[in-house]
Regions:
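Kelch-like beta-propeller repeat domains
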Residues: 19-346
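Sec-dependent bacterial lipoprotein signal peptides
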Residues: 1-17
Length: 346
């Protein structure tokens, strides 16, 4: 065969290889699907809580000067939003926490544009009414985390206007009282929490401009120290399992849990900020304490969104893609972890 023919064949092979479609490894699979937009204004730094099969989302910031007090109920069975009773106008805020305890929703702490807050409110689905409860005893703050387990609610970490915090408090709705509890992790704000099997997981966040990398689980059934440290979320160990942990660390992220996937029961962490606003998504396996990269969030890079989950389904709602009112989102996305990414289905 002549040198000319060899060159022609090699050139054709290079063209054919370069024209092959890009494929995503299985570890980067999963598909994002657009669902019904929030009926209210676009916003970021809103809160949400789940009661039964419904998600409740409200408060937040319009990117300019307005904090919201409105609240909305999402029914995933019919993919629709309906407005419920707003919080009092005086309770408008952003960067608060939302949680649920025994069929009631709670919202507390946050920022109203002028002051950091420590007030605490209860929502009753039966009366469609808000009632002010005992103020959060940890002091005014925003960008904290909150969750409910069993008969109690918990709020901790955050920023008080001067410093990042690491304290945690337990709320007893039957007595309307707060009790301080220990937390073994680092100070942080703009972290996330999620619940699985009556345990709370706290991860990500930032302190003094540094993204934190420690990861903790809270088990209220344990005696003594209820917190257990899990594997760090960066390339921290001398082993190889975390060599690819390039951008799990972040702030202002969203998280949710989906049970019964092909890979078991999983948590997902997506969006947020890591030097810039990002779209990367990671899967956490409760059984192995390991993370795997999944398909990027298909909306614009987003920060300050609400991650939530109803039975076997996970969602990300609202958030911002930049500065100003036009960058505030009213979108809702659902993540399908067992699906193959299709970038053309939205």
């Amino acid at each position: 065969m002549s040198q000319k023919n060899i060159s022609s064949i090699l050139g054709l092979w290079i063209i054919l290889v370069s024209c092959r479609p890009n494929t995503i490894p299985y570890t980067e699979n999963g598909d994002w699907i657009v669902r019904s937009q929030l009926n209210g204004p676009g916003r970021s730094e809103a809160v949400g809580f789940t009661i039964g099969s419904f998600e409740y989302l409200g408060t937040g910031w319009d990117g300019l000067n307005t904090r919201f007090s409105d609240f909305w109920k999402y029914d995933p069975a019919v993919d629709s939003w309906s407005q419920i009773q707003s919080m009092p106008d005086s309770a408008a805020r952003s960067s608060a926490v939302g949680l649920s305890i025994n069929g009631k929703g709670y919202v507390g702490t946050g920022y109203d544009g002028y002051n950091y807050l420590n007030d605490f409110w209860e929502y009753d689905t039966l009366s469609n009414a808000w009632t002010r409860k005992a103020a959060f005893s940890g002091g005014a703050r925003y960008e904290a985390v909150g969750f409910g387990i069993g008969n109690y609610g918990y709020i901790g970490t955050g920023f008080d206007g001067s410093y990042a915090l690491k304290d945690f408090y337990r709320y007893d709705p039957s007595a309307d009282t707060w009790t301080v509890i220990d937390f073994s992790g680092n100070k942080r704000y703009s972290a996330v929490s999620f619940i699985y099997k009556e345990k709370a997981y706290v991860v990500t966040g930032i302190n003094s401009g540094v993204l934190v990398n420690d990861f903790w689980v809270y088990d209220p059934s344990l005696s003594g120290n209820n917190w257990t440290e899990l594997r760090h979320i960066n390339n921290y160990s001398t082993e190889t399992y975390d060599d690819g942990y390039s951008d799990i660390v972040r702030s202002n992220a969203s998280a949710f849990v989906i049970t019964g996937t092909k890979s078991g029961d999983l948590a997902f962490l997506s969006t947020g900020e890591n030097g810039s606003i990002i779209s990367t998504t990671w899967e956490y396996n409760f059984a192995t304490d390991l993370w795997s990269r999944k398909s990027n969030f298909e909306g614009p890079p987003t920060s300050g969104a609400v991650g939530f989950y109803v039975p076997n389904r996970g969602f990300i709602a609202t958030g911002r893609s930049g500065n100003g009112q036009a960058a505030q989102s009213d979108f809702l996305w659902e993540f399908l972890p067992d699906a193959v990414l299709n970038p053309n289905d939205n």
